[in-house]
């Protein structure tokens, strides 16, 4: 799949998650070593391929903003454009200013391609300062490479 296209492989479909997906979502999120504690299936979109959950991502709602989070592609389905498709799809679904935090320069570069730019904790809306501020504390104390990013509308 071309990064600029919005087409999924023919054997895949995107849909809102259902309560039956939570176990598979948790498994995917856990496999990526992401925090599995803030998973509300109602906020997730999933890509199902050949009857199995191949990717997931969520839009978490905060006061006046949203966070793109928990975006994971199953190992067997990587390098087929599912992460790019889901990122673009979630950007289109967002109804408020959109933020994310990611680990490592590689992920930050990935999100930059979709119009996200790095921002500091001081630039964050109040509703995200505490949550993302904790990540920045971990970055400082434990040298964890956390990047906070904001989507700049019109960059897609």
Question: Which stretches of residues belong to each language-model region?
Answer:
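Helix-loop element at the rim of GNAT/NAT acetyltransferase active sites that forms part
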Residues: 16, 27-38
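A short helix-loop-beta-strand connector motif used in the catalytic cores of GNAT acetyltransferases and
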Residues: 34-50, 67, 142-145
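Conserved acetyl-CoA-binding loop-helix of GNAT-fold acetyltransferases
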Residues: 79-92
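Conserved GNAT acetyl-CoA-binding A-motif
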Residues: 92-105
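Acidic/histidine-enriched, glycine/proline-rich intrinsically disordered or flexible terminal extensions
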Residues: 132-156
């Amino acid at each position: 799949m071309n990064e600029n296209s919005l087409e999924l492989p023919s054997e895949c479909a995107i849909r809102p998650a259902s309560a039956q997906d939570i176990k598979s979502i948790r498994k995917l999120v856990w496999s990526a070593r992401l925090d599995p504690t803030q998973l509300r299936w109602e906020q997730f979109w999933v890509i199902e391929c050949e009857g199995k959950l191949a990717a997931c991502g969520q839009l978490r709602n905060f006061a006046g903003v949203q966070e793109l989070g928990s975006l994971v592609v199953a190992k067997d389905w990587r390098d087929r454009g599912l992460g790019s498709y889901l990122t673009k799809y979630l950007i289109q679904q967002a109804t408020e200013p959109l933020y994310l935090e990611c680990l490592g320069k590689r992920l930050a570069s990935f999100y930059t391609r979709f119009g996200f730019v790095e921002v500091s904790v001081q630039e964050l809306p109040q509703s995200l300062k505490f949550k993302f501020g904790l990540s920045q504390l971990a970055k400082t104390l434990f040298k964890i490479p956390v990047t906070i990013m904001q989507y700049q509308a019109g960059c897609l």
